[in-house]
C-alpha cells in the first residue's frame, strides 16, 4: 500500500469514527437531545450562512421550518466554494464543511458571528439528521449533494444552470437521536432577531410552514444595531433621555471592534446585555466590567467639571450608575478569550481596557455636547442620595 493510500485510509477511519461518536454522544456536540440541542443544529448551519453574507457585504438569510419536519436555511451569498485547490477534487470544500467538525469556510476573527455555544459547524446537522440536502449556486452552475446520517450518497452533481448565487441547506433531524424534532418558532425567532440586532443591515427571516391555519413569518433588519436593541428593550418603559446613546469604535489593543448603546429609565433595576462575536455572555466578563468602569468615569468627570458633584464627595461608582441603566455591550474580537468551557463569560484584560477607554471617551464627548441631558442623567443617578453628596 502506498503512503498516499495509507493517509487516505487513516483519514477515512477518523471521519467514520468521528461520525459514529457524534451520533452516539450527541450531547457532547450540541448540548442535549432535547429541543435545546435541536436548535443548536439550526444555529450551526445558520452561522455559516450569516458569516458568508457578512463577508460579502450584505444580503439575507432565510430560515424555514417545513411542513414535513425539515429545516431549510437559504442565503444569497457567494456559495460554498467548489473550486479545486492543488490536487483537491471539485466538491472537496463542500464535503469538508458538511462532514468534519470545526472546518467552517468562513472569515475568521472579528468578522465571525457565533450563533451556537459549541461551534461544531454544519457537520452537526449532517451527522445528526436522517437526511440532508445541500444546494450551491455558484459560477452559473447549480450543484446538489445529498447525505443520509452523515454519509454522502453521491459526489456533488451539477443540476442545471444558476442565475444567482447562494447556498441552501435542508435537513431533517434524526428522531433516533432527538427526543423531539419539533423546533420552537418562538425560541428561534428570538435568536434570529438578536443576531439581526447585533449586525446592522443584515436581513434575517424565519418562516413556519407547519401551522394548519397557514404560514407565519417574521423578518428582521435593524439599521442602528445596538441602538435599536436598547430601544427595543426600553419600548414599554419611561426613559430619562429622549434618545439612545450609541457609539462604535475599533481598538487594535484588544484586536477588535466594540459597539455600545445605553440609556436610563425611571425604573431602578439595571438591564445590561453583553455579547462577544454575537454570542450572548450571560455571565458577563471583562467587556462588561470595562463598560461599567468607563460609564462611571465619564459621568464622574463630567459632573465634577460642571459642579454637579462636590470635589471632596463620593464619585459616581459603577454601583450607582447602573440604577435604571439599560445597555447593550457587543464586542467583535479576532481572538476572544473565555472563562470556562461554556463561553458564558468573556476574559482578557485587553477587552476590559479597550472597552473602558472607548466608553470613557465617547460617552464623555456625548455628555459635553449635551449638557442639559447629561445633567438629567446625573440627577437621575443621584436623586436618592443625601443632598450633601451632590
Question: Which residues does each predicted region cover?
Answer:
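Conserved ATP-binding N-box helix of the HATPase_c
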Residues: 35-61, 121-128
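Bergerat-fold GHKL ATPase/HATPase_c domain
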Residues: 1-43, 106, 381
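Flexible helix-coil linker/hinge segments at domain or subdomain boundaries
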Residues: 349-389
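Flexible hinge/switch segments at interdomain interfaces of large molecular machines
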Residues: 15-23, 160-168, 262-278
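Short, low-complexity, polybasic intrinsically disordered segments
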Residues: 76, 336-355
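GHKL/Histidine-kinase-like ATPase module
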Residues: 186, 194, 201, 205-342, ...
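GHKL-type ATPase core
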Residues: 2-11, 60, 67-93, 97, ...
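Duplex nucleic acid-engaging cores and interfaces of nucleic-acid transaction enzymes
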Residues: 185, 193-196, 204, 292, ...
